[in-house]
């Protein structure tokens, strides 16, 4: 279910402060965050945000198409290794 429009988008304050500080300084450093629940705002465009996936920080370069989505959508938490091999030869 989508978030109510009267509430507005959610973003953690500490993440917004870090992005604003980068914009003032003009530096292009990676921002580490554990906040997968934060919505991507237009002022994030062009920055790289390292989102925690439960094991490591996955670098996510924010583009214009990502605005309005959550940061966690771009850092998958599960790694798919593939299905098991067919063991028909060993069963004989």
From Swiss-Prot:
SUPFAM superfamilies named in the record: Ribosomal protein S19 (SSF54570)
Alphabetical keyword list: Ribonucleoprotein, Ribosomal protein, RNA-binding, rRNA-binding
GO BP: any one term: translation
One example GO MF annotation: rRNA binding
Domain of life: Bacteria
Entry's transmembrane regions: none
InterPro entries: Ribosomal_uS19, Ribosomal_uS19_bac-type, Ribosomal_uS19_CS, Ribosomal_uS19_SF
Pfam families assigned: Ribosomal_S19
Stored PANTHER family: RIBOSOMAL PROTEIN S19P FAMILY MEMBER, SMALL RIBOSOMAL SUBUNIT PROTEIN US19M
Xref: HAMAP family: Ribosomal_uS19 (MF_00531)
UniProt protein name: Small ribosomal subunit protein uS19
Organism for this UniProt entry: Macrococcus caseolyticus (strain JCSC5402)
């Amino acid at each position: 279910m989508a978030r109510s429009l009267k509430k507005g988008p959610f973003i953690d304050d500490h993440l917004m402060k870090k992005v604003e500080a980068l914009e003032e300084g003009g530096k292009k450093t990676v921002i580490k965050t554990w906040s997968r629940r934060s919505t991507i705002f237009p002022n994030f465009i062009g920055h790289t945000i390292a989102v925690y996936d439960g094991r490591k920080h996955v670098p996510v370069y924010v583009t214009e198409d990502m605005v309005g989505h959550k940061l966690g959508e771009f850092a998958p938490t599960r790694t798919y290794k593939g299905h098991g091999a067919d063991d028909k030869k060993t069963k004989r």
